[in-house]
C-alpha cells in the first residue's frame, strides 16, 4: 500500500483544509476521520468541513483553569453564536458514553 503526501498550504503556510478536502474529493475520498486537538478542531469547524462530531464522555472529572478544551479558538460570547449540533446517536461503550451529532 502506497502513501502519498498532499501539500495544501494557505497564505500563512498552514494547511488549507478546504483545499485539502477538495483535493481528496477529486481522488474519490469523500470522508475522513479528523482526530486532532482543539486548534485543528476549531479550524475545521470554522471552514465548514465538519459534518459529524463524535464526543466521548468518561466517568472522570479533571477540572483546572488550564484544562484543555476540544475546540480552541476565540470561542463565542452568546449561546446563539455557538455551532449548532443535532444528536443522532448516544450509546454506552464500556464505561464511556459516545455522543454522535450532525453539524
Task: List PLM regions with ranges.
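Enzymes that bind and transform nitrogen-containing heteroaromatic metabolites
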Residues: 1-103
Amino acid at each position: 500500500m502506497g502513501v502519498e503526501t498532499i501539500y495544501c498550504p494557505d497564505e500563512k503556510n498552514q494547511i488549507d483544509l478546504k483545499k485539502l478536502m477538495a483535493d481528496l474529493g477529486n481522488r474519490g475520498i469523500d470522508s475522513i476521520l479528523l482526530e486532532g486537538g482543539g486548534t485543528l478542531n476549531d479550524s475545521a469547524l470554522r471552514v465548514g468541513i465538519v459534518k459529524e462530531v463524535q464526543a466521548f464522555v468518561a466517568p472522570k472529572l479533571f477540572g483546572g483553569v488550564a484544562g484543555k478544551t476540544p475546540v480552541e479558538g476565540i470561542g463565542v460570547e452568546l449561546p446563539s453564536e455557538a455551532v449548532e449540533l443535532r444528536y443522532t446517536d448516544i450509546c454506552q461503550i464500556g464505561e464511556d458514553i459516545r455522543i454522535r451529532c450532525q453539524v
